């Protein structure tokens, strides 16, 4: 069997969105499925990671990208004043009117490239992975033009997205366009793969024509091979990843400031938004706060492994934060260091932390609960009682990325 995987994010792009398509393309060939990948040639990535390499097992193809820069609005405006800031805001306004998202500008080159590959290589099925939501439009177009089955892989919800700022008029205006995409996926995809039950429920709400399966993200244990934990002189708690949407570090920062713990250092790999940096400065945290720039994937894994604990922050956002256990939690689980999870208590991430015994769950806005959890982890560290490897062999196998890709392969072969 031959498949074409269409993704906006692929090495040398960096960031969390790269890992699922990268690992899919890495492991599918070992299961007897010839894998072709179509990715942009230069999408002006939000992050670039030259240490990440495309898998040699897959055939990687590129289609020209002519769209806007893939940067967060806050980063686009950071440090700009006067006319430069006005021009940057105008560019952002252009991005915001593109429906369903700015990456729709890749379609004029991506769709013809995908169709050529299908016909030239004898592709049997196309997989699109989103976000960006517009990747689903490519899948629908390829199916219509070639007749091959389409599998829509949803790494995040299309409508029920906890990180989207629903209080903003521009976002509300996009809701109808996004609903049309969900309806398209439900009506046209031969199969839908979702990383959580709640995302699959979003599709089922629109009476899908094809099968819907939940295949969560997985742990890449091999990525941590050779990375060691060495107990530090201070209690190091690490957050890896960017802050966007409603993700809010302030309850944790307040809890740290009021904890009375002077030998704790909170490391934020990827930094904070400017407003949150200013907030943190007002708390007088001093050397208890370490802000690091965007790091390569490998360096971020080193930090996660060599930490007394890792910090997971997910917003509630009127219940939408329960939708998906961020891919970051699987990195944290693979690092096998305790997790302080400030997440919706009834959500998928909280369930994973509890089931694996990986750490402590508190509500994302519960400063008192976060402070008590931090003090408790610190006390266990002082007593030499922090676990270093808490997953059983059965849990490791069930959570592994290889097991997840095997499920996808089974689905593909059934089409």
Predicted regions and their residues:
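Nucleotide-activated donor-binding/catalytic signature segment of Leloir-type glycosyltransferases, i.e.
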Residues: 270, 275-301
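Membrane-proximal helix-turn-helix segments that form the acceptor-binding/catalytic region
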Residues: 23, 115, 134-137, 141-145, ...
């Amino acid at each position: 069997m031959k498949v074409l995987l269409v993704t906006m994010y692929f090495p040398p792009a960096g960031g969390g969105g790269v890992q699922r398509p990268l690992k899919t393309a890495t492991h599918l060939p070992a299961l007897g499925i010839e894998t072709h990948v179509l990715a942009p040639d230069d999408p002006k990535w939000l992050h670039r990671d030259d240490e990440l390499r495309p898998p040699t097992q897959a055939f990687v193809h590129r289609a020209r990208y002519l769209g806007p820069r893939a940067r967060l609005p806050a980063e686009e405006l950071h440090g700009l004043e006067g006319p430069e800031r006005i021009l940057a805001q105008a560019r952002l306004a252009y991005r915001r009117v593109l429906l369903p998202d700015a990456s729709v500008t890749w379609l004029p080159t991506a769709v013809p490239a995908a169709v050529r590959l299908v016909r030239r290589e004898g592709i049997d099925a196309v997989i699109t992975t989103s976000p960006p939501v517009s990747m689903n439009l490519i899948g629908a177009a390829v199916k219509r033009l070639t007749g091959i089955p389409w599998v829509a892989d949803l790494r995040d919800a299309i409508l029920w997205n906890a990180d989207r700022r629903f209080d903003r008029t521009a976002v509300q205006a996009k809701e109808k366009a996004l609903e049309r995409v969900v309806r398209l996926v439900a009506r046209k995809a031969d199969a839908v793969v979702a990383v959580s039950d709640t995302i699959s429920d979003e599709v089922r709400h629109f009476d899908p024509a094809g099968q819907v399966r939940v295949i969560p993200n997985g742990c890449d244990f091999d990525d941590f091979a050779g990375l060691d934990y060495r107990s530090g002189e201070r209690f190091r708690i690490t957050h890896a990843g960017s802050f966007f949407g409603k993700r809010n570090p302030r309850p944790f920062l307040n809890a740290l400031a009021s904890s009375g713990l002077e030998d704790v250092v909170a490391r934020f790999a990827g930094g904070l938004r400017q407003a949150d940096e200013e907030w943190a400065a007002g708390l007088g945290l001093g050397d208890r706060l370490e802000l690091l720039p965007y790091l390569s994937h490998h360096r971020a894994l080193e930090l996660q492994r060599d930490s007394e604990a890792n910090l997971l922050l997910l917003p509630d956002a009127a219940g939408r934060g329960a939708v998906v256990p961020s891919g970051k939690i699987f990195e944290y689980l693979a690092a096998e260091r305790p997790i302080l999870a400030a997440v919706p208590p009834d959500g998928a991430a909280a369930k994973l932390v509890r089931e694996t015994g990986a750490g402590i769950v508190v509500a994302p806005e519960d400063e008192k609960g976060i402070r008590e959890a931090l003090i408790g982890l610190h006390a266990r560290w002082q007593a030499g009682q922090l676990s270093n490897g808490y997953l059983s062999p059965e849990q490791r196998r069930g959570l592994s990325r290889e097991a997840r890709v095997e499920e996808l392969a089974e689905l593909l072969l059934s089409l």
